[in-house]
Amino acid sequence: PPIKPLVDIPRMAEISRDMVRGSLGALVKRDVEAASRIWQRDDEVDELHQHVYRELLTIMTEDPARIERATYLIWASHNLERIADRATNIAERVVFVCTGHVPTRDEWLDKQLANSG
């Protein structure tokens, strides 16, 4: 039987895939705005990974017979989170290539707040 319903891991895969496509598209088009949007998606994947990690640790604690399967899912989640991080790295370099500056996360968030208000 499945260790848990796989909802978050497929969602992480979808977002990570979209991030890679988005960062590569931003690179090809030299699109700073598209590259900047990648950061927001990275936070979403990070949160999903933390949720999956905590949930699977609980499962392993409650049922040691599931440790091996849960460990494989934790690694899958971790690797998807790293893919999202790599897409973010590409996006940061796109911003640098186009502007000569990579804003800090705080600068980027301030800009997003200013644009939404």
Give each language-model segment a name:
Residues 1-117:
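Cytosolic, long alpha-helical scaffolding segments
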